[in-house]
Amino acid sequence: MEKLYQLCTQKLDITSEWPERSREAFESLFGSSGGRYEKTALNEIQFRTPKIDEKRVPFSAIIHESNAGSGGYSGMSFVILPVPESEPMIAMIAGTQGISPDEHIIGKPGHSRKMNAITQWLNAQYRQKTRNDRDSSDDQKSDNDKVIAWAKREAVRTDLRVPDNVAKTFSDYKSIFDKYGKEIYGFCIAKEEILEDALKVFLDFHFEERGYQPLTQAQKDYFKLRNAWFHHLMPTVKSDDLLDLLKHRKYVILQGPPGTGKTRIANELLHNSYKGNGNPIQFHPNTTYESFIGGLFPQTDESAMGMSFKVTKGQLLDVVERALQQPDKPYLLIIDEINRADLAKVLGEAIYGFEPDDEERSVRLAYDFGGNVGRVLKMPPNLHILGTMNTADRSIAILDVAIRRRFAFLDMWPQVEVVEQLGTDATKAAYHKLLSIFVEYASEEAFVLMPGHSYFIVKDDQDATDNDQKTTKKDQTVAKNDQRTAEDNQRLTERDKQAVTQLKTSLIPLLREYMEQGYVTTFSDAIHAYIQEIESL
């Protein structure tokens, strides 16, 4: 890797030195003596380091072995393209002669998905590493100083050029875009601050797609980098981030597939950050304007009719009243399954008051509700609303634009760390297999349906973890080397059985529903095979 790093940082004569030096750098990547990949990988690829002339855009590439020794090539390629007055470009490029024989790689949704996550991570890394070196004048710097990587939404779309705004941002690379603008589907500028990481992740991505991982001595580094960029596929939502967003936007909706902990994090926030000020409610198809905002409700009395109607506050006005009574305390209203009700009807004219940037906005209500509310609804500045929404429930109508504009949306994703910490061997393996299927084959619409981590951990896992720690202390007094007793092993066996039962009774029905509803049509065979595997446990 050192020679490749030097190739990208040293000023070389592109015409005379570049081809030979780049070939040497590529060759140094293979073999246990300082290399990163096994030599058998050479059977799958060849180096293309053509001589440079004035008519040719200079490049050096690792391409599929089936290509001819010269001329245009096809398939997936890792390419480094030098330019005279700037850093080289590191890129993934589909050959000008087509994507065959790598159509099974480039055509997968996961190929583009991972390429986009890698470039997002590299941009974040570059911003982080250069932030401390910036001064106040940097606000005037061009986008080229803030963004150094880009990826096409769909790598297979070789009919689409690199967008004009991207090409203008990286104007030093105009000749490259003019020549290979349709074939480039991911690139990173070889800025020194992130160069080593960029080379590794692009190369690792290229060889992983061909079925090769780095050598044993590079495995730790490989997994560290892979885990880092993989987080951009499924970002973690932290309580502090959610709290900051609520303070800034006031009205937030957490959306994600089932089992990702949307309700849990909402209730934890209510208990810890809001000190219990507020309350959780749940919407359903029968939720009405009267139950949420307020209205006339019958009550028995001693009149001739035996009943009368009373103006009664709904769930929203109740918490508004409490927030108005204690303006120095923050209040949180949690609306679980917010999209299960017809929000336009439930909110009515009150939607006009949901304007986070206009605290003075008020709405005249149909009745006088008394108290601090009266007949005018004005959302208190200390009241925040947090909704949760299950993206797997496609039977529910999409929220209309007027409602979406007033809420900030935050995606909740399955978290591999939770499964690794609390799952059993069986559920960890099951999680990673299913995650791989969704990452590789799911469309963007289906990808958000990846079942959450709670399907892969036993319900009492936290108690089991505590018991494990207590048992370990006892074991230390009985046997050395922290050996588990037969009783411990039996308990773990029962926990494994419980975990497998949970997969069969909770996860499989969800996946079957996905198949029946047509949510996973494009990769239903893979899901069907996965279900069969789980059923055989």
Predicted regions and their residues:
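ATP-dependent helicase/translocase motor core
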Residues: 140-251, 264-265
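Amphipathic, interaction-prone secondary-structure segments
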Residues: 40-80
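Short, charged/polar surface micro-motifs in flexible loops or helix N-caps
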Residues: 53-57, 65-68, 83-88, 97-99, ...
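AAA+ P-loop NTPase catalytic core and its hallmark functional loops
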Residues: 212-445, 461-468, 477, 505, ...
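Histidine-centered divalent-metal-coordination microenvironment in nucleic-acid enzymes
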Residues: 75-81, 89-91, 454
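N-terminal "first-domain core" detector
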Residues: 1-34
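Long, intrinsically disordered low-complexity tandem-repeat segments
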Residues: 462-493
